[in-house]
Amino acid sequence: MRLLVIDGNSIANRAFFGIKLLTTKDGRYTNAIYGFLNILLSLLKECEPDEVAVAFDLKAPTFRHKMYDGYKATRHGMPEELAQQMPVLKELLADLGYRTVTAEGWEADDILGTLAAACAARKDDCFLATGDRDSLQLVSDTTTVLLAATVMGRSKTVTMDVDAIHEKYGIEPRQLIEVKSLMGDTSDNIPGVKGIGEKTALSLVQTFGSLEGVYANLNDKRIKPKQREHLMEDKPMAELSHTLGTIRTDAPIDTAEGSYAVGEGNKAAAVRLLQELEIHSLIPRFGLD
């Protein structure tokens, strides 16, 4: 069985910023919807999945926000032009037969992680479509990340499997969280250790294996005095960053095989909505004509 899991917020965000604002004659924004559905069609062609789940974040604070007040505190809110499109996108996905999944108090990342773990337990293939590099820690023999990226000014999907992680970072996928706990993450406002950037964090993890391994070898001569000083001062922040950055695999969602089989949906409603949105070109591409 092959499961495709789409990080709904991430891909919608990519679609929104990757396509100029489009509106209907009566002023409804449509660029994120149009871009998302085009990406969905490309993913279906590339993965040929048996089941599809689309994970979305909820507005409610997650366990990470409750753990650390600063978590994602520097992020700007969703642009209103995108926010207006999100409920319409979800309605369209349902009409097309695709199941969306959310979990209060959890992030879409954790839904991806939970479904990937369920697939691994069954030895099923799982494809995670996202623009968020955090999900690379989930890559395994059964899980491949399809990373939406901008290469040479053009949007494309980069396939990240175990070999690709080895080639790019020189470590195992699961060790990427060890790197993040040291370097932090400005986009999520995860603190990390002061003065430790990606290059140094990677080198430390390549040498000592993990955050725990780094702290077990603080007196090793390969750790520079200034690095040692920062590591000692910021150990609580590094440990907090490790917890915040680790994608969970136990979100309270359906994980049984068959839970995300594409249904009949409501084709007539999908056609009406696409016509209202003046996205006529997608009607035949989804087999709705």
Describe each PLM feature range.
Residues 1-129, 133-155, 159, 237-240, ...:
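Noncatalytic, basic helical substrate-engagement surface that gates or grips nucleic-acid strands
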Residues 48-50, 121, 142, 159-289:
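Non-catalytic nucleic-acid-binding/docking modules located in mid-to-C-terminal regions
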